[in-house]
Amino acid sequence: MKLLIRPAPEVAIKSKPVRQQQMRQLRQNIRKLLARLDPEIRVDGSWDRVDVDVPDGRSLAGPVIDELVRIPGISTIQEIGVFPFVDLDDVGEKAVQAYAERLKGKTFAVRARRHGDHDFRSIDLERSVGAALLQGSDAKGVDLKSPDLEVRIEVKDDSYHIAHRRHEGLGGYPLGTVETVMTLISGGYDSSVAAYLMMRRGIRSHYLFFNLGGAAHEVGVRQVAHYLWERYGSSHNVKFISVPFEGVVAEIMRSVNHRHWGVVLKRMMLKAAAEIARDYNASGLVMGDAVAQVSSQTLTNLNVVDRASDEVVLRPLIAMDKQEIIRIAKDIGTEPFARNMPEYCGVISSKPVTRARLHRVEEDEANMDPAALADAIANRTDTMVSQLLDSTQTPEEVELIQTPSVDDVIIDVRHPSEEERSPLTLTNNDVLKIPFYELNQQVAELPGNRQYLLYCDRGTMSRMHAGHLKAEGHGNIKVYAPAV
């Protein structure tokens, strides 16, 4: 299978040195990710395209396309057939072979490109192929403005290709072509979408989590960060930094006027984030704020919050409404995480200020013990995001079962996108599909007289959740770990 990849339009209009650098980075990202599927996949290209040659007969088409549509910087992916150029009639014949079935009852338009020295123009090619398709198929007709199907052909010197199928990419810039940032992540809708939008823009992002007091919350946020990285950013290594913020929260509640709690908490986070970001050479901070979504997100309050640091603060969601944010979360697969994420609500005032005054906020902060923030920063931990799930602590040891009995029920806890790519099928056992983020809710509703074995590809997620469920009193939960 041969694929033709076009970069996002913004890449194509850059100056030559910038375009070369961005295309080089895009090829490098594609090559690194596809090599995990098969090291024999070839990735080449030129200034305005990337060519991918996938070995046939290895069932790689689906996995390769699935990987490519999630790589930032790609506009379109076309599955193409490549042929030696003979004449226009031959191009028409090949087009009929490729499109006749799909054109039944549909309108179409031929879009042609030509490179090299030929005795015909691109429009001549379009007309010739269009006539062949009208004669050789049951197409409804030609519609140049809004066709049901576009037939894409490109002639280059003494060869040509016909696009069989076209897939839309993420767009944006290749990851790694813009400076690195630090994204403040809570696992909710806003921060996960903000992190995704940064990656889509080509910005490598570390993840910074402020733990306000819940172990379950950190476990959930680790899963979100790992999912985002694995789906959209795994061409680059990044860190997950966790800051124990319980002491800072307690100090705020002791020393600060309750109306300022929310604003001061954000300022403390920003102060800590700015100091930590410098240690990781991050050029900016990313937050998931949207104007007026909550009381601390008025323009006045955001201005007061930003005065806590000299670092640039990026807010990609600033003008989005909540439904738009949730729609993107659904599209990228983080909505179920956010919907089931445990929340910590210890710093919510009954009458939060909406127009904070900087001098009054600073007067409140002066009452705080600076050691609380310094200790939190000093006691932070960091983990490579690629190792996040491996390093998550399991509260209870759980039994691993290689061969289940016929009465055991297997629970596939993988994310639906992973389960669809590689379904689990067993002959002698019932298999339930319960994504890990819905386990806590659904396990309580299962019959208690059965034994349940949790399953995931690597065994890490299943062991972690089985351990948490066992700690909560579910003694009939174990792990299905088939022999490799």
From Swiss-Prot:
Pathway: Cofactor biosynthesis; thiamine diphosphate biosynthesis
GO cellular component, one term: cytosol
Main subcellular location of this protein, as a coarse class: cytoplasm
Pfam families: Rhodanese (PF00581), ThiI (PF02568), ThiI_fer (PF22025), THUMP (PF02926)
Active site: 456
Coiled-coil region(s): none
EC number: 2.8.1.4
Subcellular location, record wording: Cytoplasm
One GO MF term attached to the UniProt entry: tRNA binding
Positions of disulphide bridges: 345-456
Segments forming domain Rhodanese: 404-482
Record domain THUMP: where: 62-166
Catalysed reaction equations from the record: [ThiI sulfur-carrier protein]-S-sulfanyl-L-cysteine + a uridine in tRNA + 2 reduced [2Fe-2S]-[ferredoxin] + ATP + H(+) = [ThiI sulfur-carrier protein]-L-cysteine + a 4-thiouridine in tRNA + 2 oxidized [2Fe-2S]-[ferredoxin] + AMP + diphosphate; [ThiS sulfur-carrier protein]-C-terminal Gly-Gly-AMP + S-sulfanyl-L-cysteinyl-[cysteine desulfurase] + AH2 = [ThiS sulfur-carrier protein]-C-terminal-Gly-aminoethanethioate + L-cysteinyl-[cysteine desulfurase] + A + AMP + 2 H(+)
SUPFAM superfamilies the record matches: Adenine nucleotide alpha hydrolases-like (SSF52402), Rhodanese/Cell cycle control phosphatase (SSF52821), THUMP domain-like (SSF143437)
Biological process (GO), any one: thiamine diphosphate biosynthetic process
tRNA-binding in keyword set: yes
Function: Catalyzes the ATP-dependent transfer of a sulfur to tRNA to produce 4-thiouridine in position 8 of tRNAs, which functions as a near-UV photosensor. Also catalyzes the transfer of sulfur to the sulfur carrier protein ThiS, forming ThiS-thiocarboxylate. This is a step in the synthesis of thiazole, in the thiamine biosynthesis pathway. The sulfur is donated as persulfide by IscS.
Protein name: tRNA sulfurtransferase
